């Protein structure tokens, strides 16, 4: 006890950090040091955050430097070729350039209409959805449109969008394909040729699908009835569903889709000679969604709006992305409105899958 009292009295009355002692003039109290440390950290944090946001608002000088760097990456002749293409190409012509499919080509045409032709390569970055890196890829694709095609000769990297492996030459020689998409109660298919002309486009109700007790014989009868109306084609393209097995609530739907997929492969496949390609192929649903910019995270949204635009362009434009016969436009023009979205979703997906197949082959 006496020892504790002695220590406390020495700290309170005589110590260097005692409560009643005044610190030397040359030293700073502990709270002052802590305050200075906090101030330095706080000011450095503000400066760092300002540096991170400078690209957006506070440093036009950096933007000018990026502009000079971007324009200096190309010769005067190359810049002229790039600007000529971007300033004069139609929307359908822009879609042939890598990374300019979908909304990017639409945004370029809108920007030209509103602000006039592009005066420099840097001005292209002002177009929505086009940033520095993607702009460089677009410029390089305009200057060297055949580079990627030369690199991809031989087999297609089918892990990207098609299974099983098929030699690229066989795919490019196809004069027409039939694209097939299965739903919970129907099967839709689209017959399209190499020129992306829709030759036929139908869907059929399947009464046995996901109703009552599953009977393989009923499934087989419904599917056989659908494929009996298929015309001749070089390849049959069956959509590969993208339902995650971890989503247990959709497990019955996944089993149903896999069952129909297996039956389609069995019924449409024919005995083939050694070395000949398979006629029935899978195409990844996610790959088609990414091709048309329909992905939101890992989920694919409806392609009805994209399809309606294709049908309108087929009537209004001289060189449309897809050519629809007039009778099919009249027959299906109201099938893809928001009020009837579920009615024609499988037909929409079947046609977009066929378009994506031929367009991906051209890359």
From Swiss-Prot:
Residues spanning the signal sequence: none
Coiled coil keyword on record: no
Keywords from the UniProt entry: Mitochondrion, Mitochondrion nucleoid, Transcription, Transcription regulation, Transit peptide
A GO term for molecular function: transcription elongation factor activity
Outcome of gene disruption: Morphants show reduced movement and have abnormal neuromuscular junction morphology compared to wild-type animals.
Transit peptide: 1-23
Gene Ontology annotations for the cellular component aspect, listed alphabetically: mitochondrial matrix; mitochondrial nucleoid; ribonucleoprotein complex
Keyword Chloroplast on entry: no
Cell compartment(s), UniProt: Mitochondrion matrix; Mitochondrion matrix, Mitochondrion nucleoid
InterPro entries xref list: RNaseH_sf (IPR036397), RuvA_2-like (IPR010994), TEFM (IPR039150)
An annotated GO BP: mitochondrial transcription
The organism's place on the tree of life at top rank: Eukaryota
Recorded family membership: Belongs to the TEFM family.
Function field: Transcription elongation factor which increases mitochondrial RNA polymerase processivity. Regulates transcription of the mitochondrial genome, including genes important for the oxidative phosphorylation machinery.
Protein's name according to its UniProt entry: Transcription elongation factor, mitochondrial
Organism: Danio rerio
Source taxonomy: Eukaryota, Metazoa, Chordata, Craniata, Vertebrata
Gene name tied to this protein: tefm
